[in-house]
Amino acid sequence: MRTYTPKPGDVQRQWHVIDATDVVLGRLASQTATLLRGKHKPTFAPHVDTGDFVIIINAEKVALTGSKLQKKRAYRHSGYPGGLKSTSYAELLEKNPTRAVEKAIKGMLPKNKLAAQQLSKLKVYAGAEHPHQAQQPKPYEFTQVAQ
């Protein structure tokens, strides 16, 4: 019997909506990365983008455990010597909560050409509203949220 390889035209993509209220950031990122890659499907192949679209709402209400809010830092570099900038996650969540969630999810995707394609299927919104009602997204529930 031959190994099944999914073709890009055969992939059935669904839309999922995730409410990030009181969900731990790492748990949110790992579950979202699984949905974006398509690892929850029986037709998963690591070299084909079989993932679904994911909408994350209420990114501003995501939870970080312990003292990570003050101690964990987000880094970026301008490309020039001495151009390394760092920001605490408390500042990042206050200024741009969507970037904090996107950064965590991007870190859990593979470091290859498919990652950009998979990340383009991620839509993150700070509030409860999103413009994707026409796609009829299905709610995705987490079994455990922050205490």
Curated annotation (Swiss-Prot):
Q: Which domain of life is it from?
A: Bacteria
Cross-referenced Gene3D superfamilies: Ribosomal protein L13 (3.90.1180.10)
GO cellular component terms listed in the entry, alphabetical order: cytosolic large ribosomal subunit
For this chain's UniProt record, which GO biological process terms are given? negative regulation of translation; translation
Q: Kindly list any coiled-coil regions of this protein.
A: none
- Short name of any one Pfam family annotated for the protein: Ribosomal_L13
Keywords, alphabetical: Ribonucleoprotein, Ribosomal protein
Q: Which InterPro entries match?
A: Ribosomal_uL13, Ribosomal_uL13_bac-type, Ribosomal_uL13_sf
Its biological purpose? This protein is one of the early assembly proteins of the 50S ribosomal subunit, although it is not seen to bind rRNA by itself. It is important during the early stages of 50S assembly.
Give the family this protein belongs to, as stated in its UniProt record.
Belongs to the universal ribosomal protein uL13 family.
Instruction: Provide the assembly information.
Output: Part of the 50S ribosomal subunit.
HAMAP family from the UniProt entry: Ribosomal_uL13
Q: What is this protein called?
A: Large ribosomal subunit protein uL13
**Source organism (scientific name):** Kocuria rhizophila (strain ATCC 9341 / DSM 348 / NBRC 103217 / DC2201)
